[in-house]
């Protein structure tokens, strides 16, 4: 395991880092600047790579594009990620699904997923519209959700 992507600083997104770090001490956490500042306060001592909205990170195996994720009602600076080589969009809690999605996927058009993002997911209309516009510029094959069923994107 080389990387772990942490979308935002909540226990269900990063609470198990110490378990992974113990097994993979050379791993790197990819996260927002806010999360990078907070992780050491929770005991994480490993490598951290800060992803900034509108930027990219590449190595031999991956090519990641980062998006601002004003997550939850607090509008904290989280991060969304699109890995271009695999076509996977890591959506955090933005496109979550309820229910046990273990081993299951659903099919839906990417545009429908973007249009379904509403003020309950991003509680600022200006930031919501900006993110929707940015996401319309990519075409993922799969949405890896933070909770529930992953989504196979239909064309």
Residues of each region from the PLM?
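Metallo-beta-lactamase
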Residues: 27-153
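Hydrophobic/aromatic beta-strand patches that form the interior of the parallel beta-sheet core
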Residues: 5, 30, 65-67, 89, ...
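Short amphipathic alpha-helical segments
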Residues: 17-19, 42-43, 103
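Short, basic, glycine/proline-bearing loop/turn elements
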Residues: 2-4, 61-64, 112-119
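Short acidic, glycine/proline-enriched helix-loop-strand junctions
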Residues: 25-27, 152-155
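Active-site metal-binding motif and surrounding structural segment of the metallo-beta-lactamase
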Residues: 1-30
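Conserved H-loop
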Residues: 8, 34, 147
């Amino acid at each position: 395991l080389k990387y772990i992507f942490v979308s935002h600083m909540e226990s269900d997104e990063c609470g198990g880092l110490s378990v992974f770090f113990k097994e993979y001490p050379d791993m790197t956490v990819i996260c927002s600047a806010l999360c990078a500042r907070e992780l050491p306060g929770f005991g994480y001592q490993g490598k951290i790579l800060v992803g900034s909205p509108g930027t990219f990170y590449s190595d031999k195996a991956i090519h990641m594009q980062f998006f601002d994720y004003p997550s939850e009602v607090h509008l904290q600076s989280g991060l969304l990620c699109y890995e271009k080589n695999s076509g996977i969009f890591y959506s955090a809690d933005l496109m979550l699904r309820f229910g046990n999605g273990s081993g299951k996927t659903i099919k839906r058009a990417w545009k429908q997923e973007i249009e379904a993002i509403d003020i309950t997911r991003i509680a600022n209309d200006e930031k919501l519209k900006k993110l929707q516009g940015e996401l319309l510029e990519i075409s993922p094959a799969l949405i890896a959700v933070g909770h529930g069923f992953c989504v196979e994107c239909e064309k």
